[in-house]
């Protein structure tokens, strides 16, 4: 017996009843980014594997364990993008849009892919909205990105459910000094570390700081502190960021163990976290990557950005009951017509309504049917009102308007007054 066709594990369909919430969320973010002056960029979901090895780092978990990599017919190694920053940097380099210090404030949306163990809030195909800013190096732009996300949480009604965590990783030179001190300290206590941390000690020791192993965390209590190795430039930058967040009234906590999972970060790193989703608590994260463009072959170009996971934020909206009631309704009006002449008149009326009321969500019954069956479909559609057109209404050039939600009697409305009457009725519903 052949195996039934189904989606790949960890890669989910977004069904029609889920789509309105996704469109609401994506539209809210896109509208906000427009008001801040950010421009959208779209990059392919497939890139040369070398791009991610050079940007993310060859010895990271993402490159070593999680990427979907394959060889094409030309023998080139290609990878489904695991994150959006590297592709965005590649695009601005390839097209020269950051040359001569030109500022670029960009955003993107799309699918990312990582071969991880699927669980609630973590998937193998997932969606991100990300922002990247090039050629601005002050703490003011770092603050703008955080203020932008804070405003978004307000629009979504979730400010009380998220917390901002901040840290500074310093410059690459300061981080190298700290790395040496941390390795020396942990090497003397190697057997007390968990297996993952022992492996990371050689490849990516800073990642040990966010280990979930209790024994490792106990060892880290006495470890050197990153803030003690920060250079003056990074200290001034970090103080400037904190001062701006204080001025904007945005609460935050300093998390000295926040290092982020990608090698390219420097100076500012931040995460928005929630305790409402269990283990998958990070809903938005980002930071500064001033050396990445040069690392990928470009001229020295500063960069800062963030990415947010759409699935987790939608899950948070649902968990908190913050899904607007209006978006669960996909149709405002359902038109029922009985008889061939009424159907023809109904088509003309419906197109006239769409001309007069461009935002109207109007469904016209298709496939005929009795009054009872059409009215049942109208009610099931979730529409606020049914429009009823039969021989009697046709003779009088009227149409019946019947509320489907709540109280109210059917009214007969003249065709030429229908658009105005509908607009008022929907606004008051």
From Swiss-Prot:
Its main location: cytoplasm. InterPro entries: aa-tRNA-synth_II (IPR006195), aa-tRNA-synth_II/BPL/LPL (IPR045864), Anticodon-bd (IPR004154), Anticodon-bd_dom_sf (IPR036621), His-tRNA-ligase (IPR015807), HisRS-like_core (IPR041715), HisRS/HisZ (IPR004516), HisRS_anticodon (IPR033656). It is found in: Cytoplasm. One of its GO terms (biological process) is histidyl-tRNA aminoacylation. One of its GO terms (molecular function) is ATP binding. Gene3D superfamilies: Anticodon-binding domain, Bira Bifunctional Protein, Domain 2. GO terms for cellular component: cytoplasm. Keywords: Aminoacyl-tRNA synthetase, ATP-binding, Cytoplasm, Ligase, Nucleotide-binding, Protein biosynthesis. Homodimer. HAMAP family: His_tRNA_synth (MF_00127). PANTHER family: HISTIDINE--TRNA LIGASE, MITOCHONDRIAL-RELATED, HISTIDYL-TRNA SYNTHETASE. Belongs to the class-II aminoacyl-tRNA synthetase family. This is Histidine--tRNA ligase. It comes from Pseudomonas putida (strain ATCC 47054 / DSM 6125 / CFBP 8728 / NCIMB 11950 / KT2440).
């Amino acid at each position: 017996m052949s195996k039934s066709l189904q989606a790949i594990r960890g890669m989910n369909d977004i069904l029609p009843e889920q789509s309105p919430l996704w469109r609401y969320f994506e539209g809210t973010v896109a509208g906000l980014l427009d008001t801040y002056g950010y421009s959208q960029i779209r990059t392919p979901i497939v890139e040369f594997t070398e791009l991610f090895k050079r940007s993310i780092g060859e010895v990271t978990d993402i490159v070593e364990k999680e990427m979907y990599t394959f060889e094409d017919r030309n023998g080139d190694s290609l990878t489904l993008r695991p994150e959006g920053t590297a592709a965005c940097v590649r695009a601005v380099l390839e097209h020269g849009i950051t040359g001569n210090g030109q500022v670029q404030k960009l955003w993107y949306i799309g699918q990312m892919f990582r071969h991880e163990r699927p669980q609630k809030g973590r998937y193998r195909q997932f969606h991100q909205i990300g922002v990247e800013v090039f050629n601005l190096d002050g703490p003011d732009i770092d603050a703008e990105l955080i203020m932008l996300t804070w405003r978004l949480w307000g629009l979504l009604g979730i400010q009380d459910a998220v917390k901002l965590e901040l840290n500074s990783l310093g410059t690459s030179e300061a981080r190298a000094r700290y790395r040496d001190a941390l390795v020396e300290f942990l090497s003397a206590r190697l057997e007390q570390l968990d297996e993952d941390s022992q492996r990371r000690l050689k490849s990516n020791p800073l990642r040990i700081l966010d280990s979930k192993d209790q024994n490792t965390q106990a060892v880290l209590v006495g470890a050197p502190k990153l803030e003690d190795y920060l250079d003056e430039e990074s200290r001034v930058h970090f103080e400037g960021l904190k001062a701006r967040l204080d001025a904007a009234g945005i609460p935050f906590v300093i998390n000295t163990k926040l290092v982020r999972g990608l090698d390219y970060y420097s100076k500012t790193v931040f995460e928005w976290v929630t305790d409402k989703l269990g283990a998958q608590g990070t809903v938005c994260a980002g930071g500064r990557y001033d050396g990445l463009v040069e690392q990928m072959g470009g001229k020295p170009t500063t960069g800062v950005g963030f990415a947010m996971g759409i699935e987790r934020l939608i899950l948070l909206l649902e968990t908190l009951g913050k899904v607007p009631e209006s978006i669960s309704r996909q149709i405002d009006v359902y038109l029922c017509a009985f008889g061939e002449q009424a159907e023809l008149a109904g088509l003309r009326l419906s197109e006239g309504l769409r001309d007069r009321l461009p935002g109207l969500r109007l469904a016209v019954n298709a496939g005929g049917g009795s009054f009872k069956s059409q009215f049942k479909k109208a009610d099931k559609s979730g529409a606020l009102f049914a429009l009823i057109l039969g021989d009697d209404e046709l003779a009088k050039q009227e149409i019946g308007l019947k509320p489907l939600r709540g109280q109210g009697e059917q009214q007969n409305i003249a065709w030429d007054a229908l658009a105005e009457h509908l607009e008022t009725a929907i606004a008051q519903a």
